[in-house]
């Protein structure tokens, strides 16, 4: 009944942008039976002072529709979204309130699903092999399937909702999504995903098919810029697939859909996270480069100190070698002048061996 009434309201100009009082009066006038013919008063009786007001002309100060929108929304919040979608038939003012609540309900159920999915993902392990054996694996599967269903509903309805041509019509789908999400939150061992989501898939598929077949053709004629292509070419628009395609492309360029904006926002967030990671890596690399430069400076200082020590050792060795030679020459001179000592050859051998050992040690140190 709600779907047929939505089609009828779309044909009449239905986006719900009209005066509430006039519609309620017109609708009640159509539902009221014709008044009986007036009878003349009997002779001798007095005529009434003023005619009685019909029910349609009674003051509406005490009716539900006359309340502020906030009060009406607070009252309707105790009802299901399916009942709210059926209340759109009451009058145009009630239609406006119900449309607003249905649109807000779809956005709220999306946020609630994102919150549930974030909580489940935080408890799951990061490895895919461990996730399959985890106790929350079925919870994650059900939430992933609900996310797919929400994406399909978003692509089907929200383009026209953002253009203020209609509202999110199937309130029963919102109720079913809430039922599934509450079931996932309250159950430790839920059933398989296809068993839990069978009803949601059925009613959402029927709602999307009916919307595409019956309501979208009516709404396409009301899209802003539907006749712009014909006026730009100097001729009236020709109905057909090409004209509809041109209209949709023009509208999509002028007013980007909500899905495209969401994708751009996600891409910006991803790029921002990547830039943050790169900045962190660059700062770490700079710290490492500074540490390496400090180590190189320390090594250069140590090398300079070692070079100075080696130079000092070489100078000392040269001085000792010179002194040793002088001693040996004096010893050889004294031994050759006397020629009587038997130990002079032994002293010469020892002196030559000492000189050779000093020379070898000096060569080895120079090589080092």
From Swiss-Prot:
Q: Which InterPro entries match?
A: F-box-like_dom_sf (IPR036047), F-box_dom (IPR001810), FBXO28 (IPR039719)
One GO cellular component term? kinetochore
Q: Which keywords does this chain's UniProt record carry? A: Centromere, Chromosome, Kinetochore, Phosphoprotein, Ubl conjugation pathway
Q: What is its main location?
A: nucleus
Q: Which residues carry this modification: Phosphothreonine?
A: 270
The leader peptide range reads none
Spell out the molecular function terms from Gene Ontology: identical protein binding
Gly residues bias locations: 12-21
Write out the ranges of the annotated region (Disordered). 1-56, 328-368
UniProt biased composition (Basic and acidic residues):
1-11
Quote the biased-composition stretches of kind Low complexity, using this chain's numbering. Answer: 22-32, 46-55
Q: Where are the compositionally biased (Pro residues) regions? A: 33-45
Residue span(s) of domain F-box: 61-109
Specify one Pfam family.
F-box
Q: Does the keyword Phosphoprotein apply?
A: yes
Top-rank taxon of the source lineage equals Eukaryota
User: In which compartments does the protein localize?
Assistant: Chromosome, Centromere, Kinetochore
Asked whether the UniProt record includes Phosphoprotein among its keywords, one would answer yes
Chain positions with Phosphoserine modification? 235, 242, 344
Subunit-structure text: Part of a SCF (SKP1-cullin-F-box) protein ligase complex.
Biological function: Probably recognizes and binds to some phosphorylated proteins and promotes their ubiquitination and degradation.
Name of protein: F-box only protein 28
């Amino acid at each position: 009944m709600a779907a047929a009434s939505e089609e009828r309201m779309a044909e009449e100009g239905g986006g719900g942008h009209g005066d509430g009082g006039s519609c309620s009066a017109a609708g009640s006038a159509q539902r009221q039976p014709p008044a009986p013919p007036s009878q003349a008063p009997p002779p001798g009786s007095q005529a009434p002072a003023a005619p009685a007001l019909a029910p349609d002309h009674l003051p509406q100060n005490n009716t539900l529709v006359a309340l502020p929108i906030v009060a009406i929304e607070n009252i309707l919040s105790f009802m299901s979204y399916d009942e709210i979608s059926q209340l759109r038939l009451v009058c145009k003012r009630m239609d406006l309130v119900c449309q607003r609540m249905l649109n807000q309900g779809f956005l709220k159920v999306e946020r609630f699903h994102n919150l549930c999915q974030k909580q489940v993902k935080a408890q799951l392990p990061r490895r895919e092999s461990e996730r399959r054996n985890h106790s929350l694996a079925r919870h994650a599967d059900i939430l992933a399937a609900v996310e797919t269903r929400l994406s399909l509903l978003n692509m089907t309805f929200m383009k026209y909702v953002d253009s203020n041509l209609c509202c999110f019509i199937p309130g029963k789908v919102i109720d079913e999504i809430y039922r599934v999400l509450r079931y996932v939150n309250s159950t430790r061992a839920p059933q398989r995903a296809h068993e839990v989501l069978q009803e949601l898939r059925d009613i959402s598929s029927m709602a999307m098919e009916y919307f595409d077949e019956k309501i979208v053709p009516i709404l396409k004629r009301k899209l802003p810029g539907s006749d712009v292509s014909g006026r730009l070419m100097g001729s009236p628009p020709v109905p057909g697939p090409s004209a509809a395609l041109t209209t949709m492309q023009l509208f999509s360029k002028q007013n980007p859909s909500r899905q495209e904006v969401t994708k751009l926002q996600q891409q910006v967030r991803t790029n921002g996270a990547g830039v943050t990671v790169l900045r962190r890596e660059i700062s770490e690399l700079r710290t490492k480069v500074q540490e390496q430069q400090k180590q190189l400076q320390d090594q250069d200082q140590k090398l300079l100190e070692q070079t100075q020590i080696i130079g000092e050792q070489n100078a000392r060795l040269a001085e000792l070698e010179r002194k040793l030679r002088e001693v040996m020459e004096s010893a050889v001179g004294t031994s050759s002048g006397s020629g009587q000592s038997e130990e002079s050859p032994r002293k010469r051998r020892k002196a030559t061996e000492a000189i050779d050992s000093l020379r070898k040690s000096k060569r080895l140190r120079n090589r080092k």
